[in-house]
């Protein structure tokens, strides 16, 4: 990274999240394996602060809480080119968000991990209030991201959150079905068991 950007941010100004110091508590076991594989915890706190300051310049500080997918970019390119977005595209143009500050009305977004470097499938359903992670053969996760943005307290197995958990599992399954996710049929069969 060239100057003056390299020296623009001071590592002394970085305040690390609480989750930095206990990142694996209540998380699936594969997190430890991945951390070891990539050497994540061999670097010092000071080194991580240095890394963060050097990439700070990429963050625009523009905040928008619309939920978008990576595949929305394809529709956006068509929209930018004043072309009709094909009906077969699963994404939506983000131009109305960027230009008119519109709300895209998405209730949530689905994230997928298809077993790359881990021994199981993983799906994530993220709303503006909660985040649910379905780990096919390990502990599942549920976080109140408004009250616990650092995801320190896994609520998935807390009976007080059964209604939220069920609601989110059903929303996730509906989106999986819409996107033809092959794991949807399995989630459908076990949704009342977890």
UniProtKB/Swiss-Prot annotation:
InterPro entries: Alkaline_phosphatase_core_sf, GAG-degrading_sulfatase, SGSH_C. It holds the Pfam family SGSH_C. Transmembrane segments: none annotated. PANTHER family: ARYLSULFATASE K. This is Uncharacterized protein HI_1316.
